[in-house]
Amino acid sequence: EDTELKTLLDCAIVQALERIEESMSLEGDAIHKVLSDSMVVISEDVNSIEGTLENYRSELFTSMNKRISELLTNHKMDNMEQRLVQELAIYIDKYDVQEEITRLQSHIDTFRNTIAPNDNTDIGKTLNFIVQEMQREANTLGSKYSTSQSFKYILNIKEEIEKCREIVQNVS
């Protein structure tokens, strides 16, 4: 009787553990899909922003060149033209976001590689760090490149990163 009860109890425990493991696996698959989908959205938005950069640089240069020309004409400072052109180049470089875009793309790749199926079971801290870095780059991108055209992409990137941050807080 005790042996029979022990066998039934052992069987019930094994079944319960199998169900827990199956449930955890399904939850892990669902989390993986959400995180992967977010990386797709972020990547597409980063690529969209990158596609607008050349036009942005050109518009910025044209606008600043016009303003400088007006200043030179109105203030008769012809000897300052070369210096102003140099300042314009520095200004444009200051607002260049290619570096942030490149780093964001690198973080996306690292995130994807980290969540790829492998034997690494302790990825929560790594993902949290990557998400923090992505948020930092997105914030810098938003402060340097705030146009009406880029606003929706940057906002969407930040929302997706925040969604990922909330999820990875619970990943071990």
PLM regions: where:
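N-terminal intrinsically disordered, cationic/polar leader segments
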Residues: 1-172
